[in-house]
Amino acid sequence: MSEANRPAESKDPYLSRRTMATSPLPSAREIAAQIRKKEISPVEVARLHLDRIERFNPSLNAFVDWKPEAVLAQARAAEKAILQGDDVGPLHGVPLSIKASIDVAGHRSEAGTRLRAGYMAAEDAPLVARLRTAGAVILGVTNTPELLMAWETDNLLYGRTNNPWDLTRTAGGSSGGEAAAIAAGLSAGGVGSDGGGSIREPAHFCGICGLKPTPGRIPSTGHFPKSGGPFALLGVVGPMARTVGDVQVLFETMAGWDDGDPSAAPVDVRPIQEKTMRDVAVGFFEDDGRTPVTQETRSAVQGAVSLLSNAGFRVDPFRPEGLEEARQLWWKFFGTAGGMIQGPMLRGHESELSPILREFYSWTAAEPVHSGQSLLATWLGRDEVREKILVQMRKYPVLICPTAAIPAFRHGEREWLIEGKTVKYLDAWSYCEWFNLLGFPAVVIPITVSPEGLPIGVQIVGRPWAEEMVLAIAAALEEGRGPWAGPPIEHA
C-alpha cells in the first residue's frame, strides 16, 4: 500500500502504535480492554470506525444506514462512564454493526426489499438491547439480499455488496453486508442471521468467524421475517466477528430466553473445562460424496485436522450417513414452505422484486406445493434423520467439514467446474444447509487462503446446545493457526 493511500494515524498512543490500517485488525476484546485501561477513548474508536466507513463503504457497499452523530453520542456516553469509574460491560465502547433485518431503534429494517422501503424500527430487538447493556456502540445496519433469499448480497434498494478481498466477487449472503464490514474493519463485530448458511457462508467468503447457534439459544425477536412454523426450526440469529473469542463474547451477551420468541430456551452459558474439551473425539470429512469441493477447500479441512492433531486432539475420518436426506428435507422446508409463507406478501408485487429473488422463487415454483399432509411428513422426516445422525455422533460429537464447495465466487456466476463435475448454484451451499435442518450449532473459522488470494474457512459442528464446545474447539484451532491478517487494505 502506498504512503499516499495510508490513512493518517491518530495521535492517540494506542492507535499510533497499532492503527486499524494494519493487519491483523484489533479484536473487539482488545478494543474493550484498551478502553477499560483508559489507553484509548471510546470517542476516538467511534471516529476511527466512522472514518473507515466513509472511506471504504463506497466500494464495499456494506452499510446501508448509519448516523454519525448518534454513534458519537453513544461513544461520549461510554467515555463519560469510564471517566466516572462506573462498572462497565464486556463490550463497553466497542463499535458493532447489525444486519438490516434485525430491529435497531431509529434505523431502517427493510430486509433489502422495496416492499418494506423506508420502514424504521421503533425499538431495539432484545439481542440489540443486550449488546447495548454490555456497553456496545451500535454503528448502524448492513446490507442484505431481498428478503434474505440468496447466497449473495444484492437488492434493488441499495445494490450489490462487494468482497473486501476482491471487489469483483461476492461477500456472500444473506449476511454479506455484515461479513464485508467486519472483515474490512468498518465494524469490530456484529450480528447476522442464518436459515441456510447466511452467517457461515459470508464468514467463509470474507475470512471472518461466525456462529450459527442452536435454534432458541439466542432470541430472534425483532427479526424479519419473523421466526415461526418451519422457519423456527431452521432460522437463527448469531454473532459474527474477526476472532473466535469475540464471537464467544457476543454469543454470551445475546444468549438467553425472551418471551417474544416462542422457540427461545432458558439455557445458561456453560464454560467448557479443558479436560472435557480434550476428551472429545472429533470427526472430519472433506466432501459429502455428492457435491465435490475445490482442492483448496480440501486443503483447508486437512490443515484444520493437522492443527488439532498437533494440539493433542483425537481427529478421525467420519462422515455421518443421512446428509443427502437432510439436504432434501431442508429444501422442502426452506424453499417450498418459505415460498408459501411469504407468498401473500409478494403476490401482486412480482414486478417490484429483484432478479435474484425472482430467480429463487422460480426454483421453488418447480417443487410441489405442500399440503398439510406433506408438510407433516416433511416434519416427521426431519425428526427421523436428526435422530439417525445424532446416534452416529455419539462417538464423534464434534465434526469438521467444508463450509461451501468453493471460495467467494465472481458476481453473477451460477455454476462451477470442480473435479470434472459441474456444480450448480443451489448445490454449492449444501454443506451449510444440513445443519440448519438438523438444528446443530456450527461455527466457521478461516484457515487458509486460496492461490487466488481468497479466504477458505471450515465449519466446526456440534450436537444441539453445544455452542460452548464448538467455540472451545474453534478457539484451539485458532490458536494453532495463529493471527489472521485479513483482507489487503488496498482491496477495501
Residue ranges and their predicted role:
Residues 42-47, 76, 295-319, 342-351, ...:
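Acyltransferase
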Residues 3, 12-73, 310-312, 486-492:
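An N-terminal boundary/leader segment
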Residues 49, 71, 247, 282, ...:
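Residue-level signal for inorganic ion chemistry
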Residues 91-111, 274-285, 333-390, 402, ...:
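Short helix-loop capping/hinge segments that flank enzyme active sites or metal/cofactor-binding pockets
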Residues 81-156:
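Acidic/His- and Gly-rich active-site-bordering loop/insert found
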Residues 212-303, 322, 344, 475, ...:
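A short helix-breaking turn/cap at a secondary-structure junction
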Residues 38, 49, 93, 133, ...:
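Glycine-rich, small-residue loops and helix-cap segments
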Residues 123-254, 436-457:
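Short glycine/serine-rich loop segments
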